[in-house]
Design a protein with these regions (language model features):
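Short, basic, glycine/proline-bearing loop/turn elements
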Residues: 47-51, 100-111, 153-160
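The Walker A/P-loop phosphate-binding site
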Residues: 1-100, 115, 120-128
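Residue-level recognition of the N-termini of beta-strands and the immediately preceding loop/turn
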Residues: 74-76, 103, 133, 181
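Intrinsically disordered, low-complexity linker/loop segments enriched in Gly/Pro
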Residues: 79-82, 98-108, 140-141, 148-149
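P-loop NTPase motor core
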Residues: 111-183
């Protein structure tokens, strides 16, 4: 039986004695949030920051990116869904050692508007193939599903973004801690 499982799925069977604890690093977001979170955000987790417009969520996310690069040497991916991230925002964070050259911005371009499915597929790919990275999604509330972007405005039978997000979260939840990716 064991040989059949290994043949079909690879080396997925482990002796209980071989299981070791891999302590997860706690990544610094910024001083105030670190205090509120008991030190920061554990790597390999999905961290959602909410709040009204113009309270500093994007600046906090960029500070998180700078800390991830500076202190933990993380690859950083930033999904600029709202399209509001500007060069001046990145320049304002250079004092915090954000290396914009080592950061990948994911965003729609003229003639190529990314749907929720496409954005989340890109992030899903990062989660599965870029261990130890940090992926920022700015912001979930700006996501529009493919059917919302291309469908008839009178058609109420569209796949909601909430369903897309739920599927995305289920897909990545077990992979995040194994690959130590923080979203």
């Amino acid at each position: 039986m064991s040989k059949d499982i290994i043949k079909e799925y690879g080396n997925v069977l482990h002796d209980p004695a071989s299981i070791t604890e891999r302590p997860l690093e706690v990544l610094s977001v910024g001083p105030k949030l670190d205090i509120a979170l008991g030190g920061g955000v554990p790597e390999g987790s999905l961290f959602i920051m909410t709040g009204p417009e113009k309270v500093g969520k994007t600046v906090t996310a960029l500070t998180f990116c700078a800390n991830a690069q500076k202190h933990y040497e993380r690859k950083v991916y930033y999904a600029n869904i709202e399209g509001r991230l500007k060069k001046r925002d990145l320049q304002g964070i250079t004092d915090l050692s954000l290396d914009a050259e080592k950061m990948q911005i994911i965003g729609s371009t003229e003639g190529n508007i990314l749907s929720a499915e496409k954005y989340l597929s890109i992030i899903d790919n990062i989660v599965h193939t870029q261990p130890g990275s940090l992926a920022i999604v700015d912001s979930f509330s700006a996501l529009s599903s493919e059917s919302e972007l291309t469908g008839d405005l009178s058609d109420m039978q569209v796949m909601s973004v909430q369903k897309v997000l739920a599927k995305f979260c289920r897909r990545i939840s077990n992979v995040l801690p194994i690959n130590r990716v923080t979203v």
